[in-house]
Design a protein with these regions (language model features):
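PLD/PLD-like phosphodiesterase catalytic module centered on the HKD motif
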Residues: 1-22, 27, 35, 50, ...
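Non-catalytic alpha-helical coupling and interface elements of nucleotide-dependent molecular machines
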Residues: 14-15, 29-31, 60-67
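Segments surrounding the PLD/"HKD" phosphodiesterase catalytic module and close analogs
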Residues: 25-58
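Charged, low-complexity surface segments at secondary-structure and domain boundaries
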Residues: 38-45, 69-77
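Alpha-helix boundary/interfacial micro-motifs
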Residues: 44-46, 65, 144
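Short, compositionally biased "basic patch" segments
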Residues: 48-69, 83-84
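Gly-rich Lys/Arg/Thr-decorated short loops/hinges at beta-loop-alpha junctions or inter-strand turns
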Residues: 65-74, 99-101
């Protein structure tokens, strides 16, 4: 399929007295029993139908069994992620223009996409407070008067992979 996959999902499908039930765990880190003694990654365990259906659909796409569907809850690259992020940035920009609270906090591996960067600059100029945590390369220039003054970037460039952990 030519896709780069970086997802932490475990899906158990079980037939019980009420029919098919899907149990799903999604997390930020690897399923590694030796490191589990030292820290806990952030995860979600659910049997809510809409998440289970999305997980089943995702596995079907990754194995080549089907084409990407319209997901109920999942935001999946490469098709769903860009429109989702664009819509969220535009929504916060509109909130700021209406005098409503407007803030963006995002943690990303890198920020090099010109269109997303342009939307973030527009949001900053509208008054949106933006905090970005960028692990790798960042092409956005923060803190420039009357251009990106509402944007703050924290860089966590380094040789160690970093996850949210408790």
């Amino acid at each position: 399929t030519g896709l780069k996959t970086h997802c932490k999902i475990c899906l158990v499908v079980r037939k019980d007295k009420d029919g098919i039930r899907r149990y799903l765990h999604m997390g930020t880190g690897n399923y590694n029993d030796s490191t589990a003694r030292f820290y806990t990654d952030i995860g979600m365990f659910t049997c809510r139908e809409e998440y289970g259906v999305d997980a089943s659909s995702l596995f079907n796409v990754l194995t080549g069994y089907s084409t990407p569907p319209e997901y109920n809850k999942f935001i999946v690259a490469p098709h769903g992620m860009r429109p989702f992020f664009e819509a969220m940035i535009i929504q916060e920009t509109e909130n700021a223009k209406l005098g409503l609270p407007a803030k963006i906090t995002a943690k990303v591996n890198s920020l090099v996409d010109p269109e997303i960067i342009s939307l973030l600059y527009d949001a900053s100029n509208a008054g949106v407070k933006i905090d970005l945590i960028v692990r790798g390369i960042c092409c956005l220039v923060p803190g420039v008067h009357e251009f990106s003054e509402n944007i703050r970037v924290i860089s966590i460039v380094g040789q160690l992979l970093e996850h949210s952990r408790i």
